Amino acid sequence: MVNSGHRRQRIINCVAQLPYKIQLGETNDEWNIVPATGSSSLYSSIEYLNSEEKAKDYEQHVLGWTGEIGRESLPSRLFNSKNRDKSENGEKGENDLHAKEEREKEEDPLYLTNDQIDGITKDLRRHGKSDDHYNVDNVHPVWLLRRDQKRWRGFAENVLWPTFHYILKFSSDSGEKENLSWYDYVRFNEAYAMKIGEIYEKGDIIWIHDYYLLLLPQLLRMKFNDQDLTIAYFHHSPWPSNEYFRVLPRRKQILDGLMGADRGWFQNEGFARHFVSSCKRLLDSTSRKSKNRLGMEQYQISAYGGDIVVDSLPIGINRVKLLEDTFTKDIAQKVLAIKDAFQGKKIIVGRDRLDSVRGVVQKLRAFETFLSMYPEWRDQVVLIQVSVPSMKGGTNQLIRLEQQVNELVTSINMQYGSLNFSPVHHYYMRIPKDVYLSLLRVADLCVIASVRDGTNTTALEYVTVKSHMSNYNCYGNPLILSEFSGTSTILKDAMIINPWDSVAVAKSINRALSLSRDEKRALEDKIWPQVPTIQKWTDQFLSTLSDIVDEAHNTTDRKMTPALNRPALLEHYRQSKRRLFLFDYDGTLTPIVQDPAAAIPSARLISILQKLASDPCNQIWIISGRDQAFLNKWLGSRLPQLGLSAEHGCFYKDVDEENWINLTEKFDMSWQEKVGSIMEEFTRRTPGSFIERKKVALTWHYRRADPELGEFYASELKKELDKICADYDLDVMEGKANIEVRPKFVNKGEIVKRLVWHHHGRRQDMLNTKKEELPISEMPDFTLCLGDDFTDEDMFNQLNDIEAVWKKQYEDEVNQWGGFGLYPCTVGSASKKTVAKAHLTDPQQVLDTLGLLVGDVSLFQSAGTVELDSRGHVKHSDSSIRSEQASARYAMKRQQSYKN
């Protein structure tokens, strides 16, 4: 970013949790703030942006959830004899977490007064200041103070994280629980949007991190509707193939959330390709490849008329600080102590979180195979495995995994150990940083056997430490790295293994331990330069973002369509007497499906339409690209009080009428044979494609074809059709995974023009021209028009044109909202390019909105984004008031207890 004048570029850095933990003291009423563990690379990037070097150009604001707030517990003694004995016997270490949770049940620390919240916020900001000149009030906590604090992690950790790591955890009885966790996830993202709204200034860059905040980019687009708003998203975890991602029930909402960003980064190109594939298959988006500033491939995805550039940029580590922290006198003493404890033995080191994707079980099995295959190494090698407890501790799956690990450790030690020696030393705990760095220094080999992860910082840190010349002949000691780790695409000269093949891993261990010193050094000289630094990652991120933002400002209209104001819509609906509803069908009243014949109306849709149609003030028209037979079968036969228009306006059937009127009856239809033969040729070339032959229009569908192949042949087909259709006065229209040919003179807009400019409630005669001399009191005073694709833009354009005419002719007749009750509303993303005045996100929200009008849905259920208080309740709701009262009572009770 170029610093304009003396104003520094503001960056709002949104993290899932602040790099601090807030704890209530054990013996008094003081609040303690301690550094949080994990996400070391991300927090290093935050520190780097706060450094004097970067703070001259950037003003960083760190915004994040406080995390679970609990009571302070005494630190566990790590690496003591008690824990070592239990670990070596394969037993589980002490679980202080359980006792802590029991205490929290008795005394909830979450009832904070406003003064306490202000005080803790000031303490957090003091911790966030690295230089008073450059950082003033730059830490912004997101308060979500509710009992069962882990609820805010529920959807992210129990649904998203497993899916991103290729773990299917869905069960038949998880629906209601998952819905509740989804609502919490939405609230979590909305709380961030609210907090950002308090500090956002025009021109800010908003940098969003990882899967806790997938909805935030689009929420911010809708909230600010600022064309200069710049949003970047970085996904730190793996992104799975579409085969896995598509199992998520909320998959489209998640992708739509990310479409609000200007640019999205992933840890490697494979993850980026998976994301692009998911968008193409689930959002009907298009993509094109280009080269970024480094000459690497990037993708530009277009969906709903909005664009996002997708790139890969592996995160790095702070190499300078790591080496400074590692090579100290204190750690040198610990290194000597470890070497003395394992004199004459090769030391293999591993540190992994104990969960189902880090490969601890696979590593132990491979080590067991190694000892079996190479007896000469028995009593000569020790594996020190540190397994960090998972944040999701206590689940049945993790308990079984822990038991499995303990059984393997016991089995290996019994079979290959002795009274004086155990080949595996397993520590199930969080070890202090100095102990971890000591292990990196002393290791002869590090083994990373993860079955799925993003960037493994342990691997990067190990290689960096081994790049430093030391006194213990450890320079260049090798790294064995799983091919399923995202880091394998960075450290390409490491010993890459398949962790599921224990024999191959065993052979790699033997080879690594047998390397000569010269071979180790040659390997290190190749692999060390491949380690990315957090400084370079941060700089490259910001400079690349600058390029794409400049390009976006020059080439892309990023105006956001506001959400439909449903409370105002309901109020206007209740006061109006001549109401007209104009609905598209596919993608509006029903979701888009692979087979068009399968898009039948739901029972809920039929029920809502019946209730709307039963009101004599309402007139409802379905204006669809479907043919007459489909509309008759699924709508006309059930609801004769609906007006129907088929094939984008070629046919219509009035309310309570049986006969269809053909508006193209006098049009030359000889073109169909020639167009049909061309479509048949492309159908043969494209497996999964088919032709829908309507009475007037012909449509070539490729939704069931491979997306890349379908897009290619759709482009080729359009070129062929454009050549001949100009001679017949035909339109060649690109729809959602289809190409349609129909006469130019009929479209949905023409139908809408005749329906609106008409005596409300009277029989239609569309063969005659519209009656412009009608008084406005005879025409609709409430018109809701809903559609999702570009053919519906004709309807929106007509309504906008009608409103412009009415403003001139009937300027004294405007209603209390300053208009004429016309609501052109698109269905889709807020970033979609449209002439509509408002948007609803999907058919589900359409039904909720119509349900609101007929009393099936409450205003609260339909209202969309809401404001939350600090405990996650809707502001000013009954639950919010009760919570505030309980907080006051609790604070008073606590003060009295301390006085006593």
Curated annotation (Swiss-Prot):
NCBIfam families, per database record: HAD-SF-IIB, T6PP
Biased composition (Basic and acidic residues): 82-108
Group of enzyme by EC: hydrolase
GO terms (BP aspect): cellular response to heat; fungal-type cell wall organization; trehalose biosynthetic process
One Gene Ontology molecular-function label: trehalose-phosphatase activity
Record keywords: Hydrolase, Magnesium, Metal-binding
Cofactor(s) it depends on: Mg(2+)
Pfam family, one: Trehalose_PPase
UniProt induction comment: Repressed by salt and thermal stress.
Similarity-based family: In the C-terminal section; belongs to the trehalose phosphatase family.
UniProt protein name: Trehalose-phosphatase
GO cellular component: alpha,alpha-trehalose-phosphate synthase complex (UDP-forming); cytosol
Known pathway: Carbohydrate biosynthesis
Intrachain disulfide bonds: none
Role of this protein: Phosphatase catalytic subunit of the trehalose synthase complex that catalyzes the production of trehalose from glucose-6-phosphate and UDP-alpha-D-glucose in a two step process.
